[in-house]
Amino acid sequence: MKQSAAKQTLKITAINGVVRALGMLLRILLSRLLGAEIMGIAELSQSVHMLAITPLTSGLPLAVSRMTAKARPEDRTKPLLAGIWLVRAAALVLVPLMLLFSPQLARLTGDVRVLPSLWCSAPCILILGYSAVYNGYLYGVERSLLPAFSELVEQLFRLAICAGLLLALPHLTAPWAAAVPVFSTMTAEVLGL
């Protein structure tokens, strides 16, 4: 059993290393394709994006994982279903609030050009919430390689979509070019589910 856990840990670590390397490659590519000014806009929106997804991605996977692991085999899907319900209910409130207050959030960042990025961030609340719940469930049923592979697939899609859009649409305005990384994250998460 210990050898199996060690092998699984090594596999997850290796996959995570590849995911991080792809992320570094993406950031280098973005800085070259977008330039400093647009990267600055993207970074401002990233801060708001991270804050927006925190309610559904911080503690929820751990809670679902623990509840799933402790549940009887016939009840193991109950935490998953409860988590999905919670994500839907929270997203029903948070997504409209994000869209409604995105102009004020953009002004708060000091650069209204983050607005398209914030619009793309709103659906991420629901999508990343689902992803968090499913990952927690998979950890709870001890299938931790699936979330790792899912993350790898997401990162590959994120890189391909981001690079593809920026190369295919070279004349995007600064606000919309800065929204491409957020859009690619949203799309890659859907594909990774």
Residue ranges and their predicted role:
Residues L100, D111-Y134:
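Alpha-helical transmembrane segments of multi-pass membrane proteins
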Residues I12, N16, E43-Q46, V87, ...:
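Residue-level recognition of transmembrane alpha-helices
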Residues S4-L62, A91-L99, C124-I125, L159:
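Signature of the first transmembrane helix
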Residues L33-A36, L108-D111, G140-V141, H171, ...:
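Helix-loop interface residues and adjacent transmembrane-helix termini in multi-pass membrane transporters
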Residues L128-S150:
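Membrane-interface junctions at transmembrane-helix termini in multi-pass inner-membrane proteins
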Residues Q3, L34, I38, A52-L86, ...:
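Transmembrane-helix boundary and interhelical linker motifs in polytopic inner-membrane proteins
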Residues T68, V93-R113:
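Short membrane-interface helical motifs at transmembrane helix boundaries
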Residues S150-G164, L172-L193:
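Hydrophobic alpha-helical transmembrane segments
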